[in-house]
């Protein structure tokens, strides 16, 4: 008999689901949003500083940071930076129990590994099971009544007859810990949810402006590097005080202390800011921190100490308000001079203003005299301006407190009033630099423009073309037409072409008001005097921007244009603008022994350009040029006979 098998309906059997325990559901509900997590971090940080925290809140924080750590790192990195400074310090606090400190260490290592918690969880779980055997009552830890709170290592209980730790007791203690942690997680989450923003942790207490962040106990030398590093915390509101306008103030601190200061990027609304200081030595970093603290408290730039001979040495150009402090070498004081810088209330570290002013006047007078002896006529105007500036500066220094050892308190260039009471200009002459400093704007301006006009004149350019040097090594002196012996200098005469309306300047310098500051660059109102007022400045600009002549035609055209510009202004100056010699004078110079003296770079000329050497043997006088014979040959040359064309044909026939 055949049996037919009827098909049975197949049921979809679901896989067994894991049992839902109370701890797992509690932990699932304990995941916090980012705002609540930030509030929980602030609450835990405040509790750790006041030794009034609970292990449950730290457990909840650890559980959430394992999940939301990377997201919080990207959103609010400054919050984690401030909190982990406290976590590092609290992990070394012996008043906290072992369990709390282990969780803090796990948090620190978790962030150090970029929130990769694979190996970290297994390691700290084994350590936690050992430390939890001792006192299960530590979950209700109170800093005031905790027995053995100052113990740094756990003391294991000993059973009566065995003398070891029971594995069953350890498992039971671990289960009790998990249950207690799960029960307290929801309570900690509720506390964090209702927390207010006033409980936000602040590393800097009132009255303190800078503090060590805790990352380095002191300026630490980086292994394998040649520099030290330290990290401090300042208020974010004080960042502008340290930074200054366009970073000038922090650059001055870096220059004085020879360090590099880096500010941490923070989000808007951050209360504090981390600052890293890198320097070659520990004392330089400490000095930078002292300068930062002094700058924040005074809300002013640090005081720059300059040697007295360099007073007024830093100067700016005519069209720039920035100082050239970048060329000043940084000076870091030693221990004793550092104390002299910072102890402003010590009377023994100061000298009287009168003595300092006299000392400065003597040194400036000596420097001016030496400058006059070297350059003579070229720096006559500079000497007068420098003497007036030195006298004015010495007078202005009276009544101010100055430091000894030939040092003077200089004004900071990182503030808005960096040029108040002091005017500085620079005149460039080739590779050389002339600096003019004074307290009278008109006098300094006149000195600069007079020097610009002189160094762009035809006389000075002719001396440059003749090979005159400014380094003192050249023995050749170029001939020049001297200035008139009587009367004032030529550039002070009202009718001369110096490029400056001195009649306006002299009249306005008596009252020294602000209306005449732009007289030099103002458009002239009178058509007749416009040419004479603009000739000097126009010639100065042409000399700086014109191309050097390479052909006689171009040079002749330029000289003709200069003579046309100078016509009608001053015949004496126009005649002195160009120096020419006749052939007899040049032949007389050729017979001088100086014309046969070897130049200083003779060896270099032989190596680089041997083709230009005409006489190879200088000892052979027969091959030398004889001026007398050449002049006689010109005068006694035979006259050529001029013959007509028809006579030439007759001769040919």
UniProtKB/Swiss-Prot annotation:
Which InterPro entries does this one have?
KH_dom, KH_dom_type_1, KH_dom_type_1_sf, Mxt
Note the SS bond partners.
none
Q: Which CDD domains match?
A: KH-I_Mextli_like (cd22454)
Gene3D superfamilies assigned to the protein according to its UniProt record, in alphabetical order: 1.25.40.180, K Homology domain, type 1
Q: Where is the composition biased (Low complexity)?
A: 314-323, 525-536
> Could you tell me where this protein is found in the cell?
Cytoplasm; Cytoplasm, Cytoplasmic ribonucleoprotein granule
Q: What is the effect of changing residue 605 to D?
A: Abolishes interaction with eIF4E1
One GO BP:
female germ-line stem cell population maintenance
The main location is cytoplasm
Q: Which GO terms describe its cellular component?
A: cytoplasm; cytoplasmic ribonucleoprotein granule; RNA cap binding complex
Q: Does the keyword Cytoplasm apply?
A: yes
By its UniProt entry, which PROSITE patterns does this protein fall under?
Answer: KH_TYPE_1
Keywords assigned by UniProt, alphabetized? Cytoplasm, RNA-binding, Translation regulation
Q: Where is this region: Disordered?
A: 311-335, 515-570
Q: Which PANTHER family match?
A: EUKARYOTIC TRANSLATION INITIATION FACTOR 4E-BINDING PROTEIN MEXTLI (PTHR20849:SF2)
Q: What else is known?
A: The name 'Mextli' derives from the Aztec god of storms and war.
| Entry comment, domain topic | Binds to eIF4E1 using a novel tripartite interface in the C-terminal domain comprising a canonical helix which engages the eIF4E1 dorsal surface, a non-canonical helix which engages the eIF4E1 lateral surface and an auxiliary helix that lies anti-parallel to the canonical helix on the eIF4E1 dorsal surface. The tripartite binding mode compromises its ability to compete with eIF4G1 for binding to eIF4E1 but once bound, the complex is very stable and is resistant to competition by eIF4G1.
Function (record text): Plays a role in promoting translation.
Q: What is this protein called?
A: Eukaryotic translation initiation factor 4E-binding protein Mextli
Lineage of this protein's species?
A: Eukaryota, Metazoa, Ecdysozoa, Arthropoda, Hexapoda
Instruction: Give the gene symbol.
Output: mxt
């Amino acid at each position: 008999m055949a049996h037919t098998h009827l098909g049975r309906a197949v049921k979809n059997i679901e896989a067994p689901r894991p049992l839902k325990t109370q701890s797992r559901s509690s932990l699932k509900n304990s995941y916090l949003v980012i705002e609540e997590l930030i509030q929980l971090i602030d609450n835990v940080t405040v509790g750790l500083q006041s030794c009034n925290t609970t292990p449950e809140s730290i457990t909840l924080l650890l559980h959430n940071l394992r999940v939301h750590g990377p997201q919080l790192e990207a959103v609010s990195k400054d919050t984690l930076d401030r909190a982990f400074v406290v976590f590092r310090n609290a992990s070394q606090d012996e008043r906290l129990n072992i369990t709390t400190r282990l969780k803090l260490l796990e948090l620190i290592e978790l962030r150090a590994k970029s929130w990769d918690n694979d190996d970290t969880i297994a390691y700290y779980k084994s350590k936690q099971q050992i430390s939890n055997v001792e006192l299960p009552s530590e979950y209700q830890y109170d800093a005031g009544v905790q027995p053995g709170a100052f113990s740094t290592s756990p003391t294991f209980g000993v059973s009566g007859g065995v003398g070891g730790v029971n594995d069953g007791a350890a498992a039971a203690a671990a289960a009790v810990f998990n249950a207690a942690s799960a029960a307290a997680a929801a309570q900690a989450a509720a506390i964090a949810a209702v927390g207010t923003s006033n409980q936000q942790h602040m590393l800097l207490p009132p009255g303190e402006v800078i503090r060590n962040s805790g990352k380095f106990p002191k300026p630490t030398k980086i292994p394998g590097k040649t520099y030290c590093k330290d990290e401090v915390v300042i208020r974010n509101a004080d960042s502008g005080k340290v930074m200054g306008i366009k970073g000038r103030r922090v650059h001055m601190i870096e220059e004085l202390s020879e360090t590099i200061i880096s500010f941490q990027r923070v989000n808007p609304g951050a209360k504090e800011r981390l600052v890293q200081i890198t320097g070659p030595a520990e004392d330089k970093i400490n000095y930078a921190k002292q300068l930062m603290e002094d700058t924040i408290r005074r809300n002013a730039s640090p005081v720059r100490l300059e040697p007295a001979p360099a007073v007024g040495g830093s100067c700016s150009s005519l069209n720039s308000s920035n100082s050239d402090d970048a060329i000043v070498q940084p000076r870091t004081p030693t221990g004793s001079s550092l104390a002299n810088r910072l102890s402003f209330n010590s009377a023994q570290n100061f000298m009287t203003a009168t003595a300092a002013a006299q000392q400065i006047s003597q040194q400036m007078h000596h420097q001016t005299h030496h400058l006059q002896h070297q350059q003579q006529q070229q720096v006559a105007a500079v000497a007068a301006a420098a003497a007036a500036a030195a006298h004015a500066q010495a007078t202005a220094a009276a009544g101010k407190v100055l430091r000894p050892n030939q040092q003077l308190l200089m004004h900071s260039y990182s503030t808005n009033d960096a040029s108040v009471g002091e005017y500085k200009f620079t005149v460039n002459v080739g590779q050389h630099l002339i600096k003019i400093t004074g307290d009278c704007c008109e006098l300094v301006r006149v000195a600069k423009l007079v020097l610009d006009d002189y160094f762009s004149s035809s006389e000075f350019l002719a001396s440059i073309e003749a090979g005159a040097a400014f380094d003192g090594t050249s023995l050749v002196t170029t001939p020049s037409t001297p200035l008139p012996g009587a009367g004032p200098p030529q550039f002070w005469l009202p009718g001369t072409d110096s490029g400056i309306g001195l009649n306006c300047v002299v009249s306005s310098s008596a009252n020294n008001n602000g209306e005449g500051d732009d007289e030099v660059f103002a458009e002239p109102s009178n058509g007749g005097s416009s040419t004479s007022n603009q000739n000097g400045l126009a010639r100065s600009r042409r000399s700086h921007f014109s191309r050097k002549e390479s052909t006689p035609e171009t040079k002749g055209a330029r000289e003709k244009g200069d003579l046309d510009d100078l016509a009608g202004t001053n015949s004496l100056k126009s005649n002195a603008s160009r120096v020419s010699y006749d052939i007899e004078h040049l032949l007389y110079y050729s017979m001088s022994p100086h014309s046969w003296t070897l130049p200083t770079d003779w060896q270099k000329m032989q190596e680089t350009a041997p083709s230009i050497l005409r006489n190879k043997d200088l000892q052979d006088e027969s091959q030398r040029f004889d001026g007398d014979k050449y002049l006689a040959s010109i005068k006694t040359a035979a006259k050529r006979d001029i013959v007509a064309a028809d006579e030439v044909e007759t001769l040919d026939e």
